[in-house]
């Protein structure tokens, strides 16, 4: 459950990252995309929370304890301050690619119950699609 809690924490961070990103872009397509990704990550967090509780463990209730975002979402702060849509999109993509690695790492563990593995796989696949979809937005901002 500890690793799933870490995944939960990273989903909170990603959700905050997407919300912040949506507030710093003018392009309506990008704004909508970031908002939908934030909502998706909130849903993922709820699913992970329920899973942790089902193990009899206590889920964390917010993002990174220190208040600093996870390493992959840190660089987004500087991109946001520049209001550079291309830089923001790049950092979001980098964050999603790092999330993909985190999910793959957890899926390599054989000790996960099948139901947990199925949920994490579904979330991972959605993030993988997100990485591919984000590429569609590159032409909008470049």
Spans of features found by a protein language model:
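Short, charged, amphipathic alpha-helical segments
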Residues: 31-39, 63, 67, 90-93, ...
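Carboxylate-rich helix-loop segments that flank metal/cofactor sites and access channels
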Residues: 50-100
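Secondary-structure edge/capping motif, primarily at the C-terminal ends of alpha-helices
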Residues: 18-25, 52-55, 80, 107-110, ...
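Alpha-helical bundle segments that constitute or directly flank the non-heme di-iron/ferroxidase center
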Residues: 1-26, 87-111
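Amphipathic alpha-helices that form helix-helix packing interfaces
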Residues: 7, 14, 21, 44, ...
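Preference for long, well-ordered alpha-helical segments
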Residues: 88, 92-142
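Soluble, non-transmembrane catalytic domains of enzymes that act on hydrophobic metabolites at membranes
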Residues: 4, 26-29, 47, 118-126
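Conserved alpha-helical segments that form or flank metal/cofactor-binding pockets of metalloenzymes
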Residues: 32-66, 137-141
